[in-house]
């Protein structure tokens, strides 16, 4: 199940297409198959749940957070909690988090803060910044 979860994570389009509404795979945002620090790595996220989610104003489990990724980040629909997709992804995250302290806010969790720009907003400059820093995860058209 761990390998299946990794497969879903790196090739979501192939293994979970019916739940995805855009062209993304999980690893488009969670780099290096969910292992890279400062790109919301699974090893740091898994041990941080359950946690309050402002998006739905409740305390969610890690599995529920994964379901929300399908709905919000991937513009799709949430797989059922007992679906092999969710079970596989949770199993993979659990394996990556082996040895991590539960409840700790680990260094490298989440994404780094982006500093406020020194210049006022500009559409052309913004398009250039988006192309260089954002399109890899969010696609050419966001």
Regions found by a protein language model. Name each.
Residues 1-7, 11-12, 51-122:
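Post-cleavage N-terminal segment of exported redox proteins
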Residues 1-35, 117-142:
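Sequence/structural segment immediately N-terminal to covalent heme-attachment motifs in c-type
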């Amino acid at each position: 199940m761990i390998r299946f979860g990794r497969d879903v994570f790196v090739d979501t389009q192939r293994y979970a297409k019916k739940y995805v509404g855009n062209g993304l795979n999980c690893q488009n945002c969670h780099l290096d198959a969910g292992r890279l620090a400062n790109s919301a790595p699974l090893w740091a996220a898994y041990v941080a749940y359950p946690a309050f989610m402002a998006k739905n104003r409740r305390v969610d489990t890690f599995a529920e957070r994964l379901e929300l990724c399908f709905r919000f980040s991937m513009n799709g629909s949430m797989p059922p909690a007992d679906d092999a997709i969710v079970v596989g992804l949770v199993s993979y995250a659990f394996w990556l988090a082996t040895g991590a302290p539960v409840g700790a806010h680990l260094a490298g969790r989440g994404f780094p803060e982006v500093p406020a720009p020194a210049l006022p907003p500009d559409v052309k400059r913004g398009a250039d910044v988006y192309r260089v820093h954002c399109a890899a995860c969010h696609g050419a058209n966001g």
